[in-house]
Amino acid sequence: PPFFFMGKSNTERFATLFRGLERAYGSLQIGDKDARTQKQKGQYLFVKEPRTTATFDAHLAGKQSIGVVPINEDNLCVWGAIDIDQYPLDHVALIRKVEKLELPLVVCRSKSAGAHVFLFLKDFVEAEALQLKLKEIAAELGYGGCEIFPKQIKLVVERGDNGNFLNLPYFDQEGGLR
C-alpha cells in the first residue's frame, strides 16, 4: 500500500482517500425512491463542522450516510467523480469498458443504482484541471454530459461557499449495496 496508508485503520484509509472541504460535510437521511426516475430520495443537509474518524465510522457501519465536497478551501482536489444517473445501468459493462481503456478509475454503485466513477490522485491538483479531465473521461466512456465532481472550480471561502458534496460509497459496508 502507499506510504500514507501504512499503519492506518480501514476507516483512516477511507478518510484519507476522501479528503476535501474540511469545514463541512453532507449528510443524508434516506427516503423513498422516486417511482418515475428510480432515483433515491432523501433529506440532504450540510453539517457545518469537520469530519472525524467517528463520522466515517458511522458511514461505514450504515448508521449515517455522509458526503464530501471534493474541492478544499484552497480550491484543490485529490479525488473526483463522474456521477452516472442512468437506470438501469450495466455496472459490469461499465467496469469492462474502464478496464479496456486502461483508465485508473474505481466504479461504485450509487445509492440509486447508478454509478459513481472515482479518480483518485496521489497529489492535490487544481479543481478546474480535474474537472476538465473527468469531463474528457466521461465522454470517452460514452457518458458525456454527466454530472462531474468537483462541481465548482473555485470556492470563495470568505463568502462561506461550501460547494456540492457527493455521497460516499460503502455506506453500511458489510450489508449495503454501495
Stretches found by the model and what they are:
Residues 23-27, 103-107, 145-146:
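Short secondary-structure junctions
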Residues 103, 113, 164:
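Residue-level signal for beta-strand positions within conserved beta-sheet cores that form or flank
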Residues 24, 115-121:
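Broad hydrophobic/π-residue packing in well-ordered secondary structure
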Residues 2-79, 88-95, 164-165, 170-175:
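DNA replication initiation on ssDNA origins
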Residues 7, 109, 138-139:
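Short, structured coil/loop segments at alpha-helix boundaries
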Residues 107-116:
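Short, conserved phosphate-binding/catalytic loop or strand-edge motifs used
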